[in-house]
Every structure is written in C-alpha cells, then in structure tokens.
Amino acid sequence: MVGEQPFLLGVNYWPRNKAMGWWSDFDAAEVRDEFTLIRSLGMSLVRIFLLWDDWQTSPDSVNRAALDNLGTVLDTSAELGLTLDVTFFTGHMSGPNWAPGWMLLPDEPLPPRVNQLVSGGEVVDCGYRNPYVDPVVLAASELLLKTVVAQYREHPAVGFWNLGNEPDLFAWPPAPAAGRAWVRRMTQVIRELDPIHQVTCGLHVDSLVHDNRLRVSDVFAETDFAAMHGYPMYVPWARDPLDVDFVP
C-alpha cells in the first residue's frame, strides 16, 4: 500500500489452450485450474475480456450462455480470493480485430490500420460500423452494459468495469469530441446501474504519442482512473523489447 493506493499484481487472462475461443468453448474446470495457478503465483487481479463476437451475435440480444458462464468465472474467482477487471467491447485482441457479423459492412473496405478482421470464426475482408457513433452499435453496446452490470454489480469478485482493450485499434472516432462523448455515454450507463464500482478504459502507448481522436485527457476526464498498457517492443525509442524502465 502506497498512501491510500493499493499495488495490485494481476494478469490478463485467456485460457492457455484456446485463447480467444474461450467463450465459445467454455470449460469451468479449466477456469478453476488456471485461476488456482494464478492465485498460487501471488496474483490477486485477473483481467478478462468479453469477446464481442461471442457475447452479442445479434445487436438486440446478449448471449445467455456467456452471461451464465461469466457467473461461473466470478464465483470461482471469489472462492479463490481473486478480483476481476471485466473488460467490455473486446473488438481488438492480440493482433486481429473481432467483430460480430451484424456489425460488418460487406461493401466497405477494411479500415485503415486494421491488419486482420475475424467474425464468426472466419477471417473476413470488409469494413464495419463505427462503434463510437453508429446508432445500431451504440444501442447494442448499452444493452451489453446494462445486461452484464445489472446481473453482476453486487458480485464480490467484481473489481471494476473496463470499457475496452485499446479501442482505438478497433476503430477511431470520427472526431475527438465523438470519442469523449462515447466514453461519457458508456460510463453513465454503468454508473446509473452501479455507483459503487469504478470504471476505466484500457489505452496504450499510441494514445500518448499520436492523436487517434480517443485522447487520454478526454477518456480519463470521464472515467474513474487511468489504465495504460506499456509495450516497449512496439516503440523505436525503448532500449530493448523488454526495457524494464519503459513503464516506471
């Protein structure tokens, strides 16, 4: 504890044997085994990701099986003394972007800066709706938040809610004001249901050195605390790919 701020040691989690196939091939025993290992290593926080493609196969519904499986993950975490960072809108993860089929725009090209797009388990080559301003995506996003937060806001394993994993890598807002408005809107939806747990949004170094219209100052003016992902292997000015001084 430094002052009033705890130092938490945690880990991003995907199952070792299936990675982003977790929610579509959920195994409660696997979660228990791996969370037991995480706890044995002295970690207390686990960040999990609600892969959008699995959680919302249509814009007007939330995958009930995934919702129930999240309850299993939370129960297991509580039993083991782990706290969860629950990350919504996981459209970007480990290279590819992952978009539900209803979000695709088949006649549009793949957006700039997107290396690969996966939907329904297949690599696709097309554009998709902008999550910051598209009314269909905004309504679906609010539905996902309301469903998950209402169901689990009182669960003891919930640590905080997270609006995304480096969301600028999935899409840029059309303007900085649109990016801030999106963060404000999503945060308000959560706070109306759950005034207790804090809200953050996982950004990365590119947000510090480039204007991707999802500005750090705007994001953290609307959320409760800053979350920054530092990867020295992605910047030319780090001393080496594992530069220990890159993130103090």
Which role fits each region the language model picked out?
Residues L242-P248:
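Short, intrinsically disordered, charge-balanced linker/junction segments flanking boundaries
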Residues M1-F225, G230, V235-W237, V244:
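Active-site mouth of glycoside hydrolases
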